[in-house]
């Protein structure tokens, strides 16, 4: 996968690290939450790929087989995402208000749950569980019976752990806020990240078959929009000041523009675009929508993590590109290495459907565009 690698990547990674240092020196209270949004987005890709991989193990078909290689390769990079999360655990008092003495009092139940030591332990358990699941799924690849067994148990464990992770990592940034479906929102966040990333990798090959990728992505986007709409309606009808304040912070000023940008690009644009069968089944159009969906996960993470913080605009100019370049390219290098290894072993472990060669690379087919 030489096209996934470039001699410029190390230079870009170092430039990202330099931007992080500058952003931290300007305002650590801006840099650290931005880094959290970045690593939450990056970790959503391998974990989301692992979840989608489990779904493809249970519901198998021609469209699922072609995704196994990128999904598996991404899932196996979960330990790298865990390593990238370590700075967040070190910087807890600067990121989470409940992690220092002057922080807001979250109440007795949340106070017992939201302690630095317990938070670090839970985060370590999440990544350990997801890593074990990824390895288990990889080991079950050649045995259909083991695939179904691993995926069935894994989906239950994933749904529970990812729901708690979303509450811990993002919802607890505002301790007084609570949403009964926040965990489900985070599940769709990760699933969208994983599925759209896998589609982007597969469809980046000219002539790759599209199967029913457009309909599948549209279905998940509709679920994502439905979950967000339901949370808004529930909080609006409850009319609780602490919960309403969470939305008010995201509807004002620049964050309001960011929110409407997310709605327009993540729901309105792809919804109407994929009403057209030509766009829904075209490789290039699907590739653009899938790549856009991956990128918008970072915007969504920022909207979830940053609005109720005192953000310094100058620091943000360094924090956003710096964290994306540094953490993103480190993970990308790990993914490229993992993809090479998985592709080399693919022909020995899993038969591939028509439209894919022995290495798992899509091959040109008539009618692809």
How would you name each of these model-derived features?
Residues 70-83, 148-160, 215-222, 288-297:
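Transmembrane alpha-helical segments of multi-pass membrane proteins
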Residues 44-55, 82-88, 123-135, 188-203, ...:
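Hydrophobic cores of alpha-helical transmembrane segments in multi-pass inner/ER membrane proteins
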Residues 2-19, 113-262, 279, 349-361, ...:
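Long, contiguous internal "core" modules enriched in hydrophobic/ aromatic residues
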Residues 5, 180-186, 242-263, 270, ...:
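Membrane-interface transmembrane-helix boundary segments in multi-pass integral membrane proteins
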Residues 1-49, 331-369:
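N-terminal regions that are enriched for targeting/export leaders
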Residues 37-142:
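Transmembrane-helix bundle segments that line or gate the permeation/cavity pathway
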Residues 252-304:
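Extended, compositionally biased non-globular segments
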């Amino acid at each position: 996968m030489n096209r996934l690698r470039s001699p410029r990547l190390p230079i870009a990674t170092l430039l990202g690290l330099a931007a992080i240092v500058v952003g931290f020196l300007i305002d650590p209270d801006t840099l650290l939450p931005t880094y959290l949004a970045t690593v939450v987005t990056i970790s959503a890709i391998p974990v989301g790929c692992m979840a989608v991989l489990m779904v493809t193990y249970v519901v198998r078909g021609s469209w699922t087989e072609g995704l196994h290689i990128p999904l598996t390769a991404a899932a196996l990079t979960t330990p790298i995402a865990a390593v990238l999360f370590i700075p967040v655990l070190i910087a807890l008092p600067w990121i989470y208000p409940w992690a220092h003495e002057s922080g807001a009092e979250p109440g007795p139940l949340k106070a017992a749950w939201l302690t630095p030591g317990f938070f670090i332990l839970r985060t370590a358990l999440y990544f350990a569980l997801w890593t074990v699941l990824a390895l288990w799924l990889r080991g079950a690849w050649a045995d259909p019976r083991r695939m179904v067994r691993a995926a069935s148990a894994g989906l239950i464990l994933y749904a529970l752990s990812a729901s708690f992770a979303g509450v811990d990592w993002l919802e607890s940034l505002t301790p007084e806020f609570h949403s009964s479906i926040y965990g489900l929102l985070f599940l769709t966040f990760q699933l969208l990240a994983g599925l759209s990333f896998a589609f982007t990798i597969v469809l980046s090959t000219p002539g790759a078959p599209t199967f029913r990728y457009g309909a599948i992505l549209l279905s998940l986007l509709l679920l994502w929009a439905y979950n967000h709409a339901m949370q808004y309606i529930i909080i609006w009808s409850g009319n609780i000041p602490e919960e309403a304040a969470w939305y008010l912070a995201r509807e004002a000023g620049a964050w309001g523009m960011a929110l409407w940008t997310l709605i327009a690009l993540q729901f309105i644009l792809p919804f109407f675009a994929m009403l057209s069968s030509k766009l829904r089944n075209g490789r290039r159009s699907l590739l653009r929508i899938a790549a856009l969906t991956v990128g918008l996960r970072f915007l969504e993470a920022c909207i979830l993590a940053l609005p109720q913080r005192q953000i310094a605009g100058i620091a943000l100019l360094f924090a956003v590109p710096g964290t994306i370049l540094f953490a993103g390219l480190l993970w990308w290098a790990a993914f490229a290495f993992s993809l090479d290894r998985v592709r080399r072993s693919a022909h020995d472990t899993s038969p591939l459907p028509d439209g894919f060669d022995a290495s798992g690379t899509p091959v040109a087919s008539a009618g692809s565009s």
